[in-house]
């Protein structure tokens, strides 16, 4: 990653010849000219403008390399009338329901202007679709044969270069393309409309690129891609309608310190091979040179040497060039002449960079007119706003030079149209957006396989080029690069998740088991700086499992299947280029899958009361956790490890290894004895040892001495009833190391734990709701009733009847607290009990609120706003899409002045992801003297409602005390409601 870093139209027509008569070649009618947008002109829609919330298209498998229709999965009769999904997503596609058929013999008729690479791709497609013989232009057309006619036609003035039209209706197929690559793009779409039975789905397509230049950068630090990887990538780029590849490996010294020297012969041959493959795929090769560390910028000789190098690279097949100065100093020159000519500082550096760029750009324009513009990567390529360097560069740089930037930040979470417009105003030149996603050289423990997100459509439309910087893992990069290509082609209707699923299908090449493995790998490596939830497909399975665990309706089958796919991922991907690239991550994923299955086995054994199986799975899981912790790659961050940790804790609670009255006290002396502070009533003794350990469990009975309780079980998990008073327990026989845990369970300890919130608010005349949590503390199921004792004026309802608490588990019991009308507004103590354990719940009876949101008409202020994009007023403007954000400061605050003083009864906060873990709600009558109305010490974010009863409130303030994230505070909205009259 670069850290610190109207043309002619070719028409192609296909017609089915029936007998001696030919069905006429048809075209599209009623199409209007372009409406025009920033960047590329946008042709008018075929039928209507699609709504922004258009229903998602159903993704269908794409393959890599291009699929042979005979190898793809047959479509069901129900789906045969619908066209397959096309990627990148077309701007306008309408099914016609009338397919065409590829016959065994096809007559190909081409004109002199037909793009030879498009025709070659078409020939390949027809053969894959079932054509056994393709005849040339001469000779009669055989009866019943499919006729392919390619010739010059009228210019499609309403389509930008790269646009195309395609119609399949009633046995006639017509394709036309604008510019040198439009016909090629039409063939790529036609490829995806061909069905396994040799028919072509009926459809009308009118499509064009939303970004003129779209592509991929090989710009990471580390081992560059291989010859095979680059060639395969160019084929992938052709299929996904990308048209620019920028060669900029961080490890290539011949474009950096040794830029003056020619490449070795082998590398030059490789570049020529790349150039030929790029031409076949309509991809322009770009070469980036970074001479700043080894160039005298004031030297005419050095500038001429740089021009000679670019000309040499052009002879090898590179058609576009980028000059990079992102890693240079403002105070250090590489020759004394530079200091004498330019001086020092940012403005001097800008003048020097502009001088070199202008010289190269003028040479290219004079020698190769009509070619791509030179791009300059400036030293300040990621900063925000105007600086001395940027202002000087804008004035000194020739108008024809484009400027590269990465957005605001080296790897920005988002890039907005406003940021692009601001940068363009500052540089006063066309901008090339060099997006540093999915590149991972700054986080080498990760592969970023999530979809391209966080970029507004205006970024694609307003950029002279949009290039995504790939990872060192070329095959794996195809997943996010596929989605980036989809965005760049049609940014307005880009759907990240649908595009991402199509990318997985593309890389799976029609193999269902491989597709499942790819989905598991990518699903557990989807998060990045751009955001996105990790392991999103697993989260609902995990939540469902924990919610139903231990019940008759336990649902673990889906989770078990997911873990099985994870475990099998290395085997399912074996033999593919991808497997070698991502082996560290697939191996780690397989370990997580194996660990997940062990966790499910362990929890299942607990549920069925099988101590031996549970102990075996626990030991297996522990060993796998050690191997997982030793790995140097990250997979399923924040999801997989927490699940395993929770499962281990569930077993430890079940086995009595956690804290509490029955906790394992670790042993004393030789490690096989646990002594009690005083004699206790024993119920059960649990011993967990290495399988095959021999020994005897004994209890020290006061006045009697050691009494034998029983022998150790060969499985290693032993549970023996005691039912006596003892001062100690021990295991005799084995060495201390073979006994892992010795756990006494006491009969005189509480059978269960009861947890309730300390306080609940209940509106007078209404009902407050909470949940009581009961946890079993015995080596068996616990049964009992949850009872309530409430004062007069408070009604409490709990689930009736006898409750069963499974061993080692918790049960949540809904509790409803009702405060009848007329009850005084104050606090009431309610006693809840389960067996011998009880807890006190404080019920705060609060007055009801009514009326509109008072904050909506108030005037907002804050201690400070993060940026002008997130002002204080955004938190009470009624718009759910806007928010206030503070700088990174614990003590930041937001407040609103109400339109009139009120008796305040309720405040509702809706936090963005950056929330407060501790804060206060303060009120004031004059905005100077404040009093605390509510205190929150364990904020959870999301929607938080606070009840109060404060009089004469004219100001409401949310005073932050402790941030829950590395960011500041961010509120979508703040609402305030008055007490009802």
Please provide the spans of the model-predicted regions:
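Feature activates predominantly on carbohydrate-active enzymes
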Residues: 159-309, 315-319, 326
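Disordered, acidic Ser/Thr/Pro-rich linker "stalks" and the adjacent N-terminal cap
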Residues: 620, 624-632, 636-695, 699-705, ...
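Secretory targeting and sorting signals
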Residues: 1-73
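Short beta-strand-plus-loop segments that form exposed binding edges in beta-rich domains
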Residues: 731-736, 959-966
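C-terminal functional modules
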Residues: 495-663
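Short, surface-exposed loop/turn segments at beta-strand-coil junctions that are enriched for proline
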Residues: 818-824
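Acidic, contiguous N-terminal accessory segments
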Residues: 2-15, 19, 71-170, 197-205
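Catalytic-core regions of glycoside hydrolase
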Residues: 179, 195, 220, 257, ...
């Amino acid at each position: 990653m670069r850290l610190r870093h109207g043309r002619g139209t070719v028409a192609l027509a296909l017609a089915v010849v029936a007998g001696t008569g030919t069905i006429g070649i048809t075209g599209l009618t009623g199409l209007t000219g372009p409406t025009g947008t920033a960047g590329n002109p946008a042709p008018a829609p075929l039928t209507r403008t699609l709504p922004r919330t258009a229903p998602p298209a159903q993704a269908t498998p794409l393959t890599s390399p291009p699929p042979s229709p005979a190898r793809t999965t047959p479509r069901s009769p129900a789906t045969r009338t619908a066209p397959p999904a096309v990627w990148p997503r077309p701007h306008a596609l309408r099914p016609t329901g009338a397919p065409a058929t590829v016959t065994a013999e096809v007559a190909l008729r081409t004109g002199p202007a037909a793009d030879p690479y498009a025709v070659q791709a078409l020939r390949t497609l027809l053969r894959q679709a079932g054509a056994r013989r393709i005849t040339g232009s001469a000779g009669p057309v055989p009866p019943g044969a499919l006729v392919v006619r390619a010739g010059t036609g009228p210019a499609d003035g309403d389509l930008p270069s790269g646009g195309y039209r395609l119609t399949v209706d009633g046995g006639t197929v017509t394709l036309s393309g604008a510019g040198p690559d439009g016909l090629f793009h039409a063939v790529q779409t036609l490829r995806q409309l061909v069905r396994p039975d040799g028919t072509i789905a009926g459809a009308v397509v009118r499509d064009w690129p939303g970004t003129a230049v779209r592509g991929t950068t090989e710009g990471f630090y580390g081992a560059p891609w291989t010859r095979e990887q680059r060639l395969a990538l160019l084929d992938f780029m052709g299929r996904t309608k990308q048209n620019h590849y920028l060669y900029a490996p961080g490890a290539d010294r011949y474009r950096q310190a040794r830029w003056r020297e020619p490449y070795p012969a082998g590398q030059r041959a490789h570049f020529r091979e790349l150039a030929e493959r790029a031409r076949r795929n309509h991809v322009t090769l770009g070469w980036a040179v970074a001479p700043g560390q080894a160039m005298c910028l004031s030297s005419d000789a050095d500038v001429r040497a740089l021009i000679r190098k670019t000309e040499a690279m052009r002879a090898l097949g590179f058609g576009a060039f980028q000059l990079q100065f992102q890693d240079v100093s403002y105070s250090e020159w590489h020759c004394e002449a530079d200091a004498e000519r330019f001086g020092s500082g940012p403005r001097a550096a800008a003048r020097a960079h502009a001088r070199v760029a202008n010289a190269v750009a003028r040479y290219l324009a004079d020698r190769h007119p009509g070619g791509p513009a030179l791009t300059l990567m400036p030293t300040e390529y990621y900063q925000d706003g105007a600086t001395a360097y940027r202002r000087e560069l804008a004035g000194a740089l020739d108008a024809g030079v484009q400027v590269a930037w990465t957005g605001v930040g080296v790897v920005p979470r988002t890039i907005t149209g406003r940021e692009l417009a601001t940068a363009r105003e500052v540089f006063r030149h066309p901008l090339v957006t060099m997006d540093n996603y999915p590149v991972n050289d700054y986080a080498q423990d990760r592969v970023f396989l999530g979809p391209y997100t966080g970029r507004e459509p205006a970024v694609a439309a307003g950029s002279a080029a949009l290039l995504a910087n790939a990872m060192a893992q070329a095959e794996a990069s195809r997943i996010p690069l596929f989605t980036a290509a989809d965005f760049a082609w049609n940014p307005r209707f880009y759907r990240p998740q649908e595009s991402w699923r199509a990318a997985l299908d593309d890389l799976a090449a029609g193999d269902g088991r491989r597709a499942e493995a790819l989905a598991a790998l990518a699903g557990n490596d989807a998060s990045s700086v751009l955001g996105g939830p990790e392991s999103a497909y697993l989260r609902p399975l995990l939540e469902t499992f924990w919610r139903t665990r231990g019940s008759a309706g336990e649902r673990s089958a889906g989770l078990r299947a997911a873990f099985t796919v994870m475990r099998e991922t290395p085997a399912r991907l074996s033999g593919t280029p991808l497997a070698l690239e991502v082996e560290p991550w697939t191996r780690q994923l397989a370990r997580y899958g194996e660990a997940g299955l062990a966790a499910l086995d362990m929890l299942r054994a607990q549920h069925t009361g099988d101590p031996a199986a549970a102990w075996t799975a626990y030991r297996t899981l522990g060993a796998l956790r050690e191997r997982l912790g030793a790995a140097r790659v990250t997979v399923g961050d924040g999801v997989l490890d927490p699940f395993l940790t929770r499962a281990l804790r569930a077993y430890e609670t079940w086995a009595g290894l956690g804290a509490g009255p029955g906790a394992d006290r670790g042993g004393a002396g030789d490690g096989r004895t646990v002594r009690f502070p005083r004699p206790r009533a024993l119920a059960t003794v649990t011993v967990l040892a290495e399988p095959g350990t021999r020994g005897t469990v004994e209890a020290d009975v006061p006045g009697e001495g050691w009494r034998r309780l029983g022998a150790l079980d060969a499985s290693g998990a032993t549970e023996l009833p005691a039912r006596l008073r003892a001062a100690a327990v021990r295991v005799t026989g084995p060495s201390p190391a073979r006994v892992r845990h010795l756990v006494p369970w006491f009969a005189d300890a509480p059978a269960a734990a009861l947890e309730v919130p300390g306080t609940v608010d209940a509106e007078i005349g209404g009902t407050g709701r909470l949940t009581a949590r009961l946890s079993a503390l015995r080596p068996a199921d616990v049964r009992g009733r949850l009872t309530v004792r409430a004062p007069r004026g408070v009604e409490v309802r709990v689930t009736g009847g006898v409750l069963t608490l499974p061993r080692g588990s918790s049960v949540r019991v809904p509790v409803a607290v009702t405060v009848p009308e007329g009850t005084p507004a104050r606090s009431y103590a309610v006693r809840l009990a389960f067996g011998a354990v009880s807890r006190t719940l404080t019920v705060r009876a609060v007055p009801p609120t009514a009326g509109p949101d008072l904050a909506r008409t108030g005037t907002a202020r804050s201690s400070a706003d993060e940026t002008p994009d997130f002002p204080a007023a955004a938190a009470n403007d009624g718009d759910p899409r806007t928010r206030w954000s503070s700088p990174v400061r614990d003590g930041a605050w937001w407040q609103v002045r109400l339109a009139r003083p009120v008796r305040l009864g309720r405040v509702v906060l809706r936090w963005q992801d950056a929330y407060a873990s501790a804060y206060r709600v303060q009120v004031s009558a004059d905005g100077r003297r404040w009093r605390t109305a509510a205190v929150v010490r364990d904020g959870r974010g999301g929607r938080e409602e606070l009840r109060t009863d404060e009089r004469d409130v004219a100001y409401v303030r949310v005073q932050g005390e402790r941030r829950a994230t590395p960011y500041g505070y961010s509120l979508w909205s703040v609402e305030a409601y008055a007490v009802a009259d």
